[in-house]
Curated annotation (Swiss-Prot):
This is NAD kinase. The active site is at 72 (proton acceptor). Its EC number is 2.7.1.23. It is an enzyme of class 2 (transferase). The gene is nadK. The keyword Kinase applies. The lineage of its organism: Bacteria, Pseudomonadati, Pseudomonadota, Gammaproteobacteria, Pseudomonadales. It is found in: Cytoplasm. It comes from Pseudomonas putida (strain GB-1). Its cofactor is a divalent metal cation. GO terms for cellular component: cytoplasm.
Length: 296
């Protein structure tokens, strides 16, 4: 296992709890005589930190490991910036669900110490890359760890579009939108829209229609190496949007084409050795616990 010496820290802004956790993490890492680098935006709200700072983009070039303190949204943003550097990312949960940031603040020192001592699991999570084209010219590009979503934006009208997979026509749909999700994103927006839960090790993509205007509109799971093309109807009266992880947005026009495929670079997500995906689902989604013993 890799030994980490240069540790980057990214944190969610606007939370005193995040700042308190970062202070604890900083002290813990410095006590182990490690080189700690703060993302510049979080460094601005930590006066007197005395540490080297870096932009998020450059953290991937100077660090062996990046620790994200925040919720899943914080890790999504970090993943898109760091995946191309092949740098491992570890999450400490200061958000809500915490599917990706799975270390609790109360176990920070214990779990981070295990990782630093080489006792950890590595998961390679693939991202999606999306491109919006108008008259054969790219007008917007973005990456997503969770999902790429076509939606009506501020309008309440339905969208009509065609779906192609690897150049083959699949169907046309009239719906509130369309979600294209990775296995990582299958427990996010896609799940709320009725999509299946996919184990993160699966090499697959799920296509989930949002409130389709037909009883036959159902999610489709396709090979992870597929290229998806969504063609917005030329007769559409609104300008829908494409969102990547709900954080990057592009406005489409009638007739635009959205291409979605797997990004070559993957996120290296670090977990403690006792990480259990099904336990995470059971805890976060409220699944039933073990049946009690019976006196037969």
């Amino acid at each position: 296992m890799e030994q980490f010496r240069n540790i980057g820290i990214i944190g969610r802004l606007g939370s005193s709890q995040v700042l308190d956790t970062i202070r604890r993490l900083k002290k813990f890492l410095l006590d182990r005589h490690l080189h700690v680098i703060l993302e510049d935006t979080i460094a601005e709200v930590l006066p007197g930190h005395g540490l080297q700072t870096s932009t998020r983009k450059l953290l991937g070039e100077v660090c062996d490991l990046v620790i994200v303190v925040g919720g899943d949204g914080s890790l999504l943003g970090a993943a898109r910036a760091l995946a191309r550097h092949n740098i491992p990312v570890l999450g400490i949960n200061r958000g809500n669900l915490g599917f990706l940031t799975d270390i609790r603040p109360d176990e920070l020192e214990e779990k981070v110490a295990q990782v630093l001592d080489g006792h950890y699991l590595v998961e390679n999570r693939f991202l999606l890359q999306a491109e919006v084209r108008r008259h054969h010219e790219a007008i917007g590009q973005g990456d997503a760890l969770n999902d790429v979503v076509l939606h009506p934006g501020k309008s309440t009208r339905m969208i009509e579009f065609e779906i192609y997979i690897d150049g083959q026509f699949v169907c046309s749909q009239k719906a509130d939108g369309l979600i294209v999700a990775t296995p990582t994103g299958s427990t996010a927006y896609a799940l709320s829209a009725g999509g299946p839960i996919m184990h993160p090790k699966l090499d697959a993509i799920v296509i989930v229609p949002m409130y389709p205007h037909t009883l036959s509109g159902r999610p489709i799971v396709v090979d992870g190496n597929s290229e998806l093309k969504i063609v917005v109807s030329k007769d559409l009266q609104i300008y829908p949007q494409v969102s990547c992880d709900g954080q990057n947005h592009f406005t489409c026009a009638p007739g635009d084409t959205i291409t979605v495929s797997k990004k070559p670079q993957k996120l290296r997500l670090i977990h403690p050795l006792d990480h259990n995906y099904y336990e995470v689902c059971r805890t976060k989604l409220g699944w039933g616990s073990r049946l009690g013993s019976r006196d037969d």
